[in-house]
Structure formats: structure tokens, C-alpha cells
A protein has these predicted regions:
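Alpha-helical transmembrane segments
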Residues: 8-20, 37, 121-122
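Helix-coil boundary and interhelical linker segments in multi-pass alpha-helical membrane proteins
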Residues: 28, 68-78, 132-139, 182-187
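Membrane-helix interface "capping/anchor" motifs
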Residues: 46-58, 157-169
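N-terminal membrane topogenic signal
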Residues: 1-14, 111-117
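Hydrophobic/aromatic-rich structural module bridging two neighboring secondary-structure elements via a short loop
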Residues: 48-95
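Alpha-helical transmembrane segments of multi-pass integral membrane proteins
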Residues: 80-95, 111-132, 151-158
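Short, hydrophobic transmembrane alpha-helix segments
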Residues: 20-32, 49-51, 71-72
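C-terminal transmembrane-bundle signature of multipass membrane proteins
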Residues: 159, 163-216
């Protein structure tokens, strides 16, 4: 079952994101690709926060746009991350559409505590593997780029499975990405991640409320 979408709230989100994107573009002279990435990014994450399946096609469009933006800024790990995100976006769309057992709605669940050990190990190993690759291609910030790439992939996998903790990882990732993008003169993207941070916090609160209702 697809969550009912509040069209008024969606329209407000779209209009505000377009207005903010145009304002930032006029101030920092960003290009139209970054503007389009900004708008689709805000709208896409809003749709995730309210658990609506249409977030996936919007997210796939956002991934394609930012693949080009990051390539232009020499953030090669972030560029390559978009390929992972596209594949994971297709998987997530399929998982949410298929649902749980007997094609019921996929429910929000939590990960066991021991999963955090595996997540930390995956972060360390993934960063260690990715770092020399990004450094070889003269990436702008190889360590942070690699660490955030691996963390984002983990968060996306948890999101696909509707694990509540995906929002915790996204919140940390967004906080670190903001100064990184400012340092690369991607002010619109940095502002986008500031908004995504707020939406991620809202998403965590919203999903927590839904989870408590399901567990009651």
C-alpha cells in the first residue's frame, strides 16, 4: 500500500525549493545543473521522510544530475557514488513496491545492536579500499570523500529496507558534507545538505512515531 500524499505540502515543498534554489543561484552564480539537483534533492528526501514511493523516481533523476555536478567539481568518489545510488534506487523502488511478506506494505523496523559493529567494520574497510583510488585520481578530499561515500551507501541500504537507523547515518553524513561542499565552491549543494539535514531529522522523528505505533 502506498502512503497517501498531501499534495498541498508537496506543492509547498516544490515551490520553496525552487525559490531557494533560484536565490542561491543568483547569489553564488551556480549553474542550472546544480539548481536542478537542489530542487530534486529537497523534494526527493521530503518524499522519503513521508514514506511515499514516488521518492524513488525523483531520487533517480537527482542521482543523474549530481553525477555530472560532482564530475565537474572533481569529487570523483561522490561521482562514482551516484552509480551505486542509481542501482540502489532501482532496488529500493522494487523493494518498496514489492512490500513485505505476502506483498504487504514494507514496515519500518530497527537493526539489532550488533549490526553497528558490522557497520563500523564496513566503514573502516570501505574507506581503506576507496581512499587510494580517489587519491590516485587526484580527488579534492580523498579521505572525507571516501568515508562519506561508504557511509552513504550503508545508509541507502538501510533506507531501502526501511530500517529506522538509516536516518541517524544520514544526519551525520549531511553534517560533514556541508563544509566539504563549501570548500569546493558548491554553495547551492552545501545549502541543499543543510536542508536535507533538517529533513533527515524530521524523517527520523516521523519514522520513530510510525515505528512506535506499529510496535504498540
Amino acid at each position: 500500500m502506498t502512503k497517501k500524499l498531501n499534495l498541498l505540502h508537496l506543492a509547498i515543498c516544490i515551490l520553496l525549493s525552487i525559490g531557494a534554489g533560484l536565490l542561491i543561484r543568483s547569489i553564488y552564480h551556480g549553474d542550472w545543473f546544480e539548481f536542478a539537483g537542489f530542487v530534486t534533492g529537497v523534494v526527493g528526501v521530503y518524499l522519503v521522510a513521508v514514506e511515499h514511493i514516488i521518492n524513488w523516481p525523483v531520487g533517480l533523476l537527482n542521482v543523474a544530475i549530481y553525477g555530472y555536478v560532482f564530475f565537474s567539481s572533481r569529487l570523483f568518489a561522490d561521482m562514482s557514488l551516484q552509480f551505486f545510488f542509481f542501482a540502489l534506487g532501482v532496488q529500493g523502488w522494487w523493494m518498496w513496491a514489492r512490500g513485505g511478506p505476502n506483498r504487504t506494505e514494507l514496515k519500518i523496523t530497527r537493526i539489532p545492536i550488533l549490526w553497528w559493529v558490522g557497520i563500523v567494520v564496513a566503514l573502516v574497510l570501505g574507506t581503506a579500499i576507496y581512499y587510494p583510488v580517489i587519491e590516485h585520481f587526484n580527488g579534492a578530499a580523498p579521505f572525507l570523500d571516501s568515508l562519506l561515500t561508504v557511509a552513504s551507501i550503508i545508509a541507502q541500504l538501510l533506507l531501502n529496507a526501511k530500517k529506522l537507523e538509516n536516518w541517524i547515518i544520514w544526519i551525520v553524513v549531511d553534517i560533514v558534507y556541508i563544509p566539504l561542499y563549501i570548500s569546493r565552491n558548491l554553495q547551492s549543494t552545501a545549502f541543499l545538505y543543510s536542508i536535507l539535514l533538517l529533513i533527515a531529522i524530521s524523517g527520523l522523528v516521523n519514522w520513530m512515531k510510525t515505528y512506535k505505533v506499529l510496535e504498540a
